[in-house]
Amino acid sequence: MDDIVMNGSPEVPPPQPPPEPVERPPTPPPPPPEESVAPPPPPEVVAPPPPPEDLPPAPPPPEPKKKKVGWGAKKPAATPLSVEELVRKKREADAAAARPKFLSRAERERIALEKRAKEVEAERRLKASNGVDRSATQSPSVSSEVNHSDGRTIPTGPRAMRSSDTPTAPAAMRNSHSHNKNRDLSPPPPPKSMSFGLASSKGDKRPVDDDEVAAQVALVKQRYMGADQTSTFSAKKKRKRTTDRKFNFEWNAEEDTSGDYNPLYQHRHEANFFGRGRLAGFGDDVADNVAKKYARALEDRDHEAGGIRAREILEMERRRREESTRNQLDKHWSEKKLEHMRERDWRIFKEDFNISTKGGSVPNPMRSWDESGLPKRLMELVNKVGYKEPTPIQRAAIPIAMQSRDLIGVAVTGSGKTASFLLPLLVYIAELPRIDEFEWRKNDGPYAIVLAPTRELAQQIEIEAKKFTEPLGFNVVSIVGGHSFEEQAYSLRNGAEIIIATPGRLVDCIERRMLVLSQCCYVIMDEADRMIDLGFEEPVNKILDALPVSNEKPDSEEAENSMAMSQHIGTKDRYRQTMMYTATMPTAVERIARKYLRRPAIVTIGSAGEAVDTVEQRVEFIAGEDKRKKRLGDILSSGEFRPPIIVFVNIKRNCDAIAREIKQWGFSSVTLHGSKTQEQREAALASVRNGQTDVLVATDLAGRGIDVPDVSLVINFNMATTIESYTHRIGRTGRAGKSGVAITFLGNEDTDVMYDLKQMIMKSSISRLPEELRKHEAAQSKPTRGFAKKNDDNSAFGSKGGW
């Protein structure tokens, strides 16, 4: 019974003892198996508990505690099992089991390894149990043959029936092999099972090496944790490959002692060069030291002649150093001298000020007023007027105009175009004889004419020009509508070097023989696109055709030669110079430029037709006059914007109505439109400029060229009919580098300009495009239409002369 318990459980029968051999008289019975050879171990099965009689005696029960006996003793209350408590605990256990538990990478690896180890152990046990089963189910004859001491098998039948195993070697080798096995007393291998003549290795066990275990672990990690995404690339390793073929000595460089005893290493030779010679890789400090050392050597050798030569060498080194630093990139263009500026510096300079030029032989812009090339007397007036830094159009246009080149300037409103053509004009006429020198010279007309689209712009240019002409002794006269011809003829009695006029009134004066242009050699067209929009193309052509042709420039490459164009024709006259300034370039303006300008240089500041970057554009969709008036009152009463404020409308009769509404709200207002006389216009502008009036209500008449300082807000009560008019309306604010706001009221009648308005607002960095305009159907594509009809106020100013 003890043997049964120790060797295995009752469920698995222990190996049976070998049966007795068959009784044959001639063959002696086989000896019994040796006890030293142990049978194969049974599978690891949990042993059953021993029978009750074999168990040790149980320990004595503990002595019961003395309980209180008597009337004070309490009976223990029976506590029934709480079903709710069990259900609650079960739910908590289920919830805890269902809740995902975070496992770190190390824990996941450990769990995977443990799981794999268990699988390997189970597989090993399964193989061991299969081997035991096969050994237990062997026939008694085979078992007796294997366990025989001398290894000789006892024949149990014919040889054909006894050779159940497939021979794997010659008989001699098989006998010696089995003999050695029996001599080592190792357990016999289990018999191989035959399956279709092929040996199966299911029951065989082979030793597993460490490399295979590591490979299996790596596969498990890759299966459960994914492939390793960490890159093993190393730039250092890649660089180290180049040193594989480098020969390394057995000693270090620190062990070199040749410098201690060899004088060649103690006194190294210094390379001395004469003149501009330099050693490759030496810096300027080393070159300076070499030059100074050589100069001292020359001076020590010959104090008189060597000193002169030493100073020449030092001066030569200084010039060489300046020449070398000229091409360095370490300084900004503002820190360099003019002669040290390179092409790259000029390109950066133009990008900083958003300047682009076209045309042959265009000079570089000026960085400051000191580089403008203006005469000293004119520079003093520039400083006196208060021009501190030139604007971008002034930086680019003045150097070109000073070379007697024809010029087309494309710039936004309020960019300082007036000074950019006035200053070169004064330099030009200063080289001509004085107009009051002879009586006949007074009657031949002015030296220069300046054309402006509106009276207000012409008078504004006149005020700006007199700041320079009066100290220089030049006479400036403005010829505009609204004044009598007799008054203007009286102004011309003493002659004038410069005449500033509107095209219509100037044509009237020419046709009335009040004025001739026999000696006019300088023509300026300011706001040329606006003049074309107002229908002044024909008057402009008449004026330009009335100019003399004797001093006209040739239409060839010679017109780009500044030296040839600056020379006098004959003894007194000079080549005619024509300048055109505009904000946009419509087809009609290009047609005039091709006809009357000779090889012009084109200067563009920013992009043509874009709004000023200093103006914040706001758009509000408001339908109906009453709602717009209410919104206008809210804006003016908010106190957010300081006067002066300009309100633009499209129809003249709306000006007075809106002005009356503004006065009822407690603000002072004036109107400016074509029905006003010249005196009324001048008085209205003067009141706004002086700060006496808060709000100016105007039509597009004031949309171009009117410079009212410090306008904080422009309100488009009615949207302009064209995007060009809108651009010049909002250009009344944000001038001279200051910021401003433009608010536009939109309605369904403005669908023709919604697309262009959307594009302009999108290009502005400080403006926000409203969602309603962005999604509006009319703003999705450019409308295909003809020329917009002009308002009555745009085509004429309402006065009798028409201009």
UniProtKB/Swiss-Prot annotation:
UniProt EC number: 3.6.4.13
SMART domains: DEXDc (SM00487), HELICc (SM00490)
Binding of ATP, residues: A411, V412, T413, G414, S415, G416, K417, T418
Bias (Polar residues) ranges: 135-146
Keywords tagged on the record: ATP-binding, Cytoplasm, Helicase, Hydrolase, mRNA processing, mRNA splicing, Nucleotide-binding, Nucleus
Chain location of the short sequence motif DEAD box per the record: 526-529
Motif window: Q motif: 367-395
Region entry Disordered, spans: 1-83, 115-210, 773-803
Biological role: ATP-dependent RNA helicase involved in mRNA splicing. May destabilize the U1/5'-splice site duplex to permit an effective competition for the 5'-splice site by the U6 snRNA, resulting in the switch between U1 and U6 at the 5'-splice site. May also act to unwind the U4/U6 base-pairing interaction in the U4/U6/U5 snRNP, facilitating the first covalent step of splicing.
Protein name as annotated: Pre-mRNA-splicing ATP-dependent RNA helicase prp28
Upper lineage: Eukaryota, Fungi, Dikarya, Ascomycota, Pezizomycotina
Originating gene: prp28
